Amino acid sequence: MPTLRPYTPPDAPACLALFDTNVPRYFGPHERHDFANYLLHPDRAHDYLVIEHNGHVVACGGLALDNEHTAAFCWGMVDNAQHRQGLGKQLSHARLAHAKALGAQRVTLSTSQHTQDFYAGLGFAVTHITPDGHGAGLDAVEMVLELAPR
């Protein structure tokens, strides 16, 4: 059974391998350096999680509290060979629960046209689209989910 747990620095190689399985459809190759830097120099304002299954990291993703009322999803991904098995939903629901626990009233994210329907299914709404905003062929789709007040 997949297990959700906090990211630790020894997870970095596995998370980078997940990233590589999602290039070029979901991430541009130029983004790898930024992701590696993020993993190696974690910001205490960000919470990063991994999902482990059968001893392997199969998904990872973070949540950053941008201000008192807004949180943002960051660097979320699932091993390309494991898409459509519920791991993305598990990871997203965990991050949403954490955002609510932190008192966030909304969650934002920047994704691409390839995953915007997934996030729409979780209740996120598109606020802006920038063609090729994440690189050639990867539109930047900005989305927001308003959370119910606690």
Give, region by region, the residue ranges found by the protein language model:
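A short beta-loop-alpha structural element at the N-terminal edge
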Residues: 2-15
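Active-site rim helix/loop that mediates acceptor-substrate recognition in acyltransferases
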Residues: 25-49, 53, 57, 62
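Conserved acetyl-CoA binding element of GNAT-fold acetyltransferases
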Residues: 69-80
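Conserved acetyl-CoA-binding loop-helix of GNAT-fold acetyltransferases
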Residues: 78, 84-97
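Conserved GNAT acetyl-CoA-binding A-motif
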Residues: 92, 99-112
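Conserved catalytic-core motifs of GNAT/GCN5-like acyltransferases
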Residues: 108-110, 125-142
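Conserved active-site tyrosine of GNAT-family acetyltransferases
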Residues: 119-120, 124
